[in-house]
Design a protein with these regions (language model features):
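Cap/lid and interdomain-hinge subdomains that line or gate substrate/regulatory clefts
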Residues: 1-3, 25-29, 44, 56-60, ...
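Structural motif
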Residues: 3-5, 45-49, 108-110, 174-178, ...
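N-terminal signal-anchor module of multipass membrane proteins
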Residues: 3-29
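N-terminal beta-loop-helix "entrance" segment that forms/cooperates
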Residues: 16, 34-58
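A short beta-strand-loop structural module common to alpha/beta enzyme folds
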Residues: 25-34, 255-260
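Short gly/pro/ser/thr-enriched loop/turn and capping motifs at secondary-structure boundaries
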Residues: 34-36, 114-118, 207-210, 238
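Short amphipathic alpha-helices and their capping/turn segments at secondary-structure boundaries
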Residues: 37, 98-103, 272-284
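Conserved, well-structured core segments that form the ligand-binding/active-site neighborhood
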Residues: 124-275
């Protein structure tokens, strides 16, 4: 079983799909579970939105532990802590909470997302706009556990052989791994496979894609699409706007816009009701 815990719904879905597209039956929980989760089958993935990104550090830590307590993990199960590749939210606190709750010794954190131009080198996250964030300093400042760093040169020359070094270190251990290419992320995943006990993997959807999947079935055909598909977005990012325009051009998307001015300055329920009524009409067509 593959268990993913993310701090928001986007992270839960874009990580879950990395397993679904390789033949692993994947379920996404859109909100934190309130009761114990049934133990899924061997070739399944469960991706949970903990809704913790906007919480304060201690609340995020507590929320992560609460979610972890709802699932029974076996030694052979893969645990993946999804973090934002821009490292927003409380990535260190949540990773520590997941590692502690799972009773595992080592967390392998490789948050790079090379296809998005987000890479980690020298422990520093570098973004396409030229900005940077010192992740190694962030980990050392906010972690209560031991922290180590695998530089890019060591990753590429030693690869999975680094596992032997990690098991000799103080545990529990948070290990930050440099990665500039997708091949680097595959090397990071190989370290986890070489450990004598299962780690907690931590990263973006790119690391999830790099993880080996037992009995992988590449190019699994998608199930037939539903008669109607509802797409919901509240993002102000230009990339999201471009995606919506693409859907309009390719799929004949019908848009129902919520008027933010009315939500702020008029009774919000009226605007919400108007949008819901129009959505209902479209979905019934």
């Amino acid at each position: 079983m593959y268990f993913i815990i993310a701090d928001d719904l986007t992270g839960a879905t874009d990580t879950g799909i990395q397993f679904q597209k390789r033949g692993i039956a994947t379920t996404v929980l859109v909100e934190p579970p309130k009761e114990a989760l049934p133990c899924p089958g061997e070739r399944t993935a469960l991706s949970v939105n903990a809704s913790s990104r906007e919480l304060c550090p201690q609340e995020a830590r507590d929320r992560t532990q609460e979610v972890m307590q709802r699932v029974v993990l076996r030694d052979q199960d893969t645990l993946f802590k999804k973090v934002d590749s821009l490292m927003r939210g409380n990535p260190v606190e949540e990773l520590e909470a997941a590692l502690e709750a799972a009773g595992r010794r080592i967390a392998l954190a490789a948050p790079s997302f090379p296809r998005m131009g987000r890479t980690v080198d020298g422990g520093v996250l570098r973004l396409p706009d030229g900005s940077a964030k010192d992740l190694l300093a962030l980990f050392r400042e906010r972690a209560h556990m031991a922290v180590c760093h695998i530089p890019l040169a060591r990753l590429r020359t030693e690869g999975a052989g680094l596992a032997a070094d990690l098991v000799r270190r103080e545990a529990p251990l948070l290990c930050l791994i440099d990665a500039v290419t997708e091949e680097d992320l595959s090397l990071a995943a190989e370290i986890g496979q070489a450990l004598d006990t299962p780690p907690v993997y931590c990263g973006s959807a790119a690391l999830a894609e790099a993880l080996p999947v037992r009995g992988e079935q590449p190019d699994v055909p998608c199930r037939p699409a539903a008669r109607r598909v509802l797409v919901v977005t509240g993002s102000q990012k230009k990339e999201t706007a471009a995606q919506v325009r693409r859907l309009e051009a390719v799929c004949g998307l019908h848009k129902v816009l919520l008027d933010s001015e009315r939500l702020l300055h008029e009774p919000a329920p009226e605007e919400i009701s108007r949008a819901a009524q129009r959505l209902t009409e479209l979905l019934r067509q």
